[in-house]
């Protein structure tokens, strides 16, 4: 298998993104934002009912600090969307590998 280029900056970015995405709750948030629509915390809270608004806000803060999501304020509401196009590519690739690819479905236990 080919080795990835040994570029400190790119490895650092990849590590930061994967670390932030590696949490199942944050991964779920990103999947909800992957359609390109902005969503407020309250909208995300309705969709992801297993997280309190406080926990959801903390996870969104972590994603924002990692430059994975961006915010837009409209009056008192803050809307979130995916900032980094690479994150969308990663999400699509994972969907293809683990959901769309019939060969992968056969090999999973």
Model regions and ranges:
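Short, hydrophobic-biased segments on the C-terminal half of alpha helices
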Residues: 30, 60-61
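N-terminal helix-turn-helix DNA-binding core of bacterial DNA-binding proteins
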Residues: 12-52, 74-86
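Histidine-centered divalent metal-coordination motifs
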Residues: 26, 58-59
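Residues in the helix-turn-helix
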Residues: 55
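Generic alpha-helix initiation/capping and coil-helix boundary signal
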Residues: 7-8, 48, 64
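Amphipathic alpha-helical dimerization/coiled-coil segments
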Residues: 1-13, 35, 84-109
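A short, conserved structural fragment
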Residues: 64-70
């Amino acid at each position: 298998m080919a080795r990835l280029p040994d570029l400190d900056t790119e490895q650092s970015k990849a590590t930061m993104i994967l670390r932030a995405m590696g949490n199942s709750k944050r991964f779920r948030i990103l999947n909800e934002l992957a359609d390109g629509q902005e969503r407020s915390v309250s909208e995300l809270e309705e969709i992801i009912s297993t997280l309190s608004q406080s926990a959801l806000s903390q996870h969104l803060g972590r994603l924002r600090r990692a430059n994975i999501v961006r915010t837009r304020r409209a009056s008192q509401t803050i809307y979130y969307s995916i900032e980094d196009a690479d994150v969308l590519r990663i999400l699509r690739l994972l969907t293809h590998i683990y959901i769309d690819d019939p060969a992968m479905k056969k090999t999973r236990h």
